[in-house]
C-alpha cells in the first residue's frame, strides 16, 4: 500500500513502527464483508423479532457469512501484525451521549459478540458523531454508561473535537484516558481545501 511503501522508505516516520487506529462498527459487517449475524444470517438466534420486517426489506441472507467472517478475521490479523490498532466505533454507530443506558449496553454487547471475535478485542472506543459520555470536567464516578464500557474493557475514550489543537484527560483514579481526535475524512479534507477550517 502507499502507506506501507512510505514507511519502508522512511522508517523514522512512525514511533516503533506504529501505524494508525482503525475504528470499526459491526452492524454492516467489517472490512467490506457482511459479518453481522444479526442482519445477514436469517437463522440468527438472537435477532430481535420486532425488526424482522425491516430486516427483510433492507438486507439479504448472506449464505457465505462464515467465509466472510474468516476473511475479515484474516484482514484484522494482518493489519495488527503490521502495527495497526483496531478500535470500537460502537456496533451500530450510535449517538453514545444521547442514547439510553440500555441502548449503550445492548450495542456494546453486540460489538463484543459480533466484532471482537473477528478483530481480537480492543481497549479503545472512538465515539460516533462526536458525542461523548459526559462533559469536559471528566467522567463522573456514577456515570452508568462509562462504568459499563469500563467493565467491557475500554480504557481509552475518544470523541471528535477540533475546538483546539489537541487535549487529553486522565481520570482522577487513572482509570481512563480520554482525548479529542480530529476526523480525517472526506468532509474534513473538503473543508480544508475550501479554507473553511485549518
Predicted feature descriptions by range:
Residues 1-134, 163:
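Metal-dependent polysaccharide deacetylase catalytic core of the NodB/CE4 family, i.e.
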Residues 97-198:
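C-terminal active-site subregion of NodB/CE4 polysaccharide deacetylases
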Amino acid at each position: 500500500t502507499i502507506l506501507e511503501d512510505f514507511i519502508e522508505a522512511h522508517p523514522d516516520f512512525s514511533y516503533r513502527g506504529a501505524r494508525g487506529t482503525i475504528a470499526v462498527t459491526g452492524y454492516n459487517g467489517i472490512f467490506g464483508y457482511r459479518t453481522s449475524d444479526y442482519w445477514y444470517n436469517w437463522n440468527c438466534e438472537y435477532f430481535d423479532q420486532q425488526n424482522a420486517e425491516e430486516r427483510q426489506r433492507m438486507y439479504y441472507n448472506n449464505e457465505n457469512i462464515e467465509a466472510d467472517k474468516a476473511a475479515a478475521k484474516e484482514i484484522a490479523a494482518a493489519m495488527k501484525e503490521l502495527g495497526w490498532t483496531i478500535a470500537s466505533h460502537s456496533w451500530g454507530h450510535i449517538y453514545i451521549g444521547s442514547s439510553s443506558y440500555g441502548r449503550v449496553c445492548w450495542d456494546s454487547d453486540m460489538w463484543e459478540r459480533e466484532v471482537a471475535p473477528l478483530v481480537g478485542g480492543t481497549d479503545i472506543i472512538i465515539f460516533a458523531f462526536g458525542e461523548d459520555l459526559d462533559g469536559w470536567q471528566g467522567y463522573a464516578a456514577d456515570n452508568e454508561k462509562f462504568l459499563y464500557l469500563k467493565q467491557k474493557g475500554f480504557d481509552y475514550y475518544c470523541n471528535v473535537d477540533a475546538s483546539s489543537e489537541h487535549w487529553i484527560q486522565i481520570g482522577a483514579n487513572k482509570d481512563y484516558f480520554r482525548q479529542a481526535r480530529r476526523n480525517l475524512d472526506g468532509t474534513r479534507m473538503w473543508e480544508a481545501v475550501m479554507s473553511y477550517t485549518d
